[in-house]
């Protein structure tokens, strides 16, 4: 199980969890998870399932300070050498189709403005490249041989096969993947601070038509928490 919600440099702590040397609470303390991923508690049952299944958990994300520095520096090419060395040397830039999609999606951030959008797009791509590199490296490693990989990340990193999938395919020609998107559950509650940082956006079918591929291979639709729940989610292939 590969997760975005922990940064790859923290893998040694996650390895201790994988070996059963520490529990979930100790893992959260070792990785400073509450500060680095505020809604980290939502992933306790996910890691519990992985432990029960004896599945290795791999941290995918780039260092959050480095990604923020991409934005603050004005883009990848303006990063200090030390920060640039933390990111993959080869990146798919420019990436016109994905960049157009990101220019629509990233407007959800209240701070997004046309003059600030380019560094935000490059920060997203830098994160995607870092996650794709970590995932590809683990797949090629002795520990990753003959394993099926489950990747848990936000929809914006995988929708329409853009983001992480296309970058993994570039590194692993012939790799087979399936993308599953989950509907909103209604269970997540944003804080006043998070609500203040966001704004409503609408992306139309016409705006994404030129991508010419489905948003995912499968959609898993779960009834909202405020409504009576049937026995199981309804999942279907697109």
PLM features per residue range, with description:
Residues 1-2, 56-61, 151-152, 179-181:
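A structural signal for short, well-ordered beta-strand segments and their strand-loop junctions
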Residues 3-8, 63-67, 155-159, 184-187:
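Solvent-exposed loop/turn segments at secondary-structure junctions
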Residues 4, 25, 35, 52-54, ...:
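Context-gated lysine
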Residues 9-138:
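A substrate-binding/cap region within the structured catalytic cores of diverse enzymes
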Residues 50, 148-152:
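Beta-strand elements within well-structured catalytic alpha/beta cores of enzymes
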Residues 123, 127, 153-160:
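Short amphipathic alpha-helical interaction segments
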């Amino acid at each position: 199980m590969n997760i975005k919600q922990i940064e790859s440099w923290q893998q040694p702590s996650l390895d201790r969890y994988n070996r059963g040397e520490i529990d979930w609470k100790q893992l959260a303390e070792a990785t400073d998870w509450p500060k680095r991923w505020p809604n980290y508690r939502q992933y306790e049952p996910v890691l519990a399932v992985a432990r029960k299944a004896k599945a290795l958990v791999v941290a995918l994300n780039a260092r959050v300070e480095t990604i923020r520095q991409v934005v603050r520096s004005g883009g990848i090419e303006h990063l200090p050498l030390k920060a640039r060395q933390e990111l993959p040397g080869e990146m798919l830039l420019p990436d016109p189709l994905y960049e157009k999609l990101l220019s629509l999606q990233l407007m959800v951030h209240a701070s997004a403005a046309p003059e600030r959008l380019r560094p935000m797009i490059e920060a997203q791509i830098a994160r995607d490249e870092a996650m794709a590199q970590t995932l590809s490296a683990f797949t090629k490693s002795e520990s990753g041989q003959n394993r099926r990989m489950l990747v848990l990340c936000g929809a914006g990193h995988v929708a329409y096969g853009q983001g992480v999938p296309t970058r993994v395919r570039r590194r692993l020609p012939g790799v087979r993947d399936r993308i599953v998107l989950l509907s909103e559950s209604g269970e997540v509650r944003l804080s006043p601070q998070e609500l203040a940082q966001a704004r409503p956006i609408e992306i139309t079918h016409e705006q994404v038509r030129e991508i010419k591929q489905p948003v995912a291979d499968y959609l898993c639709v779960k009834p909202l928490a405020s409504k009576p729940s049937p026995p199981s989610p309804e999942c279907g292939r697109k």
